[in-house]
A protein has these predicted regions:
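Short, surface-exposed coil-to-beta transition loops
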Residues: 9, 44, 69-73, 97-102
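Hydrophobic pocket/interface hotspot
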Residues: 21, 31, 57, 76, ...
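Hydrophobic ligand-binding cavity/cleft-lining segments
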Residues: 1-42
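Beta-strand/loop substructures that line and gate deep hydrophobic ligand-binding cavities in soluble
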Residues: 86-136, 153
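Short, highly charged C-terminal tails/helix-capping segments
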Residues: 144-153
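A short, structured loop/turn motif at beta-sheet edges
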Residues: 18, 51-52, 77-83, 105-114
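Glycine-rich portal/gate segments that line the openings of hydrophobic small-molecule binding cavities
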Residues: 43-88
Length: 153
């Protein structure tokens, strides 16, 4: 069992609607455009999204410099359209009890939308040292995908 007290939180304030932000997380075509750090790509053919409770998602990030592939996936634990996604995040098919859990919260903030990304259970896993930077970069890719400027929180 992972230590769910270990992790981090990232925020972005986006000039986009909650519906646009939700679609970026739940539409496979959009996911392929941004769900990777700056030094990687996510081929569209590698992406599958079944955004419902107990549904699964999968994608493969490809390092642009080396061609190394990083299959990633998980299971949706909570799905509240335009508001909240909770999912496991790790190797496809990994035991949910031993997999980090991500919570994405989408909330209106006046004319903007606040995105809060929280990842728990990363301490002691291979690659821990790069998870924060990787997710920060991926969220910056999301900002670019939405064609917006974000305020880092």
């Amino acid at each position: 069992m992972i230590d769910s007290s270990r992790g981090f939180t990232l925020e972005r304030l986006l000039d986009a609607t909650p519906e646009q932000v939700w679609a970026a997380w739940t539409d496979a075509d959009e996911v392929a455009e941004w769900w990777h750090p700056a030094d990687a790509t996510t081929p569209r053919e590698s992406v599958s999204v079944d955004a419902r409770v107990d549904g699964r998602y999968a994608y493969t990030m490809v390092n642009q410099a080396t061609g190394e592939e990083y299959p990633t996936g998980g299971q949706y634990l909570e799905v509240v359209p335009h508001d909240r996604l909770v999912f496991t995040w790790g190797n496809p098919g990994a035991d949910p009890e031993d997999t980090p859990v991500a919570t994405v919260t989408i909330a209106s903030a006046g004319d903007l939308t606040r995105l809060t990304f929280d990842l728990r259970g990363v301490d002691g896993m291979a690659g821990d040292e790069s998870f924060y930077d990787g997710w920060a970069s991926a969220l910056d890719s999301l900002v670019a995908h939405l064609g917006q400027t974000a305020v880092h929180g």
